[in-house]
Regions:
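Catalytic cores of nucleotide-sugar-dependent glycosyltransferases that transfer UDP/GDP/TDP-activated
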Residues: 1-274
Length: 274
């Protein structure tokens, strides 16, 4: 029987980024999904400037590198590197661009102020991930997005890459975490994010008054949602409760791995029945 394919898109991953709850949670998922769930895996994340290439033995994948990612008529070179996770044969692909990711901090400066171009970084990373998967020639059954940086992936798969056969049968899961990074709505957001000739009106679910609300938009376009944290703001909690799609409740560190695999398989079963 052909193995099902799981694409994990991570904004953080232990041991490559800071030791956070999200980074630790995601780190255990790929190996478990492969060994216990029987999945074939690909793991993609940004190549932040904070990642030590020598320590983690990153090397460039020449056959995948050399693409330019076009955002609002501007070209951004994409370099793809790979490394094996410690004590594992599991490979992680790192998406590198000097303009957006070669910095001393991940999401905010030394004073804790979020980078002004975080919304552009989200656009770039989301498009770069999908272009990389196309280059793989590898059609994912499940696309599991973790964190705000991946929030545009569900929209892009559904609307900007809807004519790409490689994504025709993908089920998209968005894991939402209790994080607030983006804030005020940049005036050029819809223009920049409407990639591949997409209608700007498709970005409306991401707009919440004068705020850029990546959770609201990701909830709208994802096929299913996983609660990565136990608690959220009242507004986020209410949005999750009102979703008319599958939601996996928060799972603690002892239960989340088998529960995620079961959730994947339920979603794939529902898709195959349609």
């Amino acid at each position: 029987m052909t193995k099902k394919r799981l694409l994990v898109i991570a904004q953080e991953l232990d041991p490559y980024t800071e030791d956070t709850y999200m980074a630790n949670l995601i780190a255990k998922l790929p190996q478990f999904a492969q060994d216990k769930g029987g999945f074939e895996l690909r793991v993609l994340m940004p190549k932040y400037g904070t990642i030590n290439e020598r320590r983690h033995r990153l090397h460039e994948v020449v056959r995948l590198s050399g693409m330019n990612i076009i955002i609002d008529d501007d070209d951004y070179p994409l370099v793809i590197k790979v490394a094996s996770m410690p004590n594992s044969r599991m490979q992680v692909y790192f998406l590198e661009n000097e303009d957006y990711f070669k910095r001393k901090f991940m999401f905010a400066d030394e004073n804790g102020k979020g980078f002004d171009d975080n919304h552009e970084r989200m656009i770039f990373f989301s498009k770069a991930v999908l272009e990389t998967v196309k280059k793989f020639g590898w059609a994912p059954d499940i696309i599991h997005c973790h964190g705000w940086l991946t929030s545009l992936v569900p929209l892009f798969v559904k609307e900007a890459y809807n004519h790409e056969p490689i994504f025709n049968h993908s089920t998209i899961i968005y894991s939402v975490y209790d994080e607030n990074v983006l804030g005020a709505l940049p005036e050029n957001f819809a223009q920049k994010a409407s990639i591949n000739g997409m209608n700007q009106a498709l970005l409306d679910p991401f707009i919440d008054g004068d705020q850029l609300n990546e959770k609201k938009g990701a909830f709208y376009y994802a096929d299913a949602v996983i609660k990565g944290n136990e608690t959220y703001s009242d507004a986020v909690t209410e949005r999750i409760e009102n979703l008319d799609k599958p939601v996996l409740e928060y799972q603690d560190k002892d239960t989340y791995l088998p529960q995620y695999i079961e959730f994947y398989k339920k979603l794939m079963g529902a898709t195959e029945e349609e």
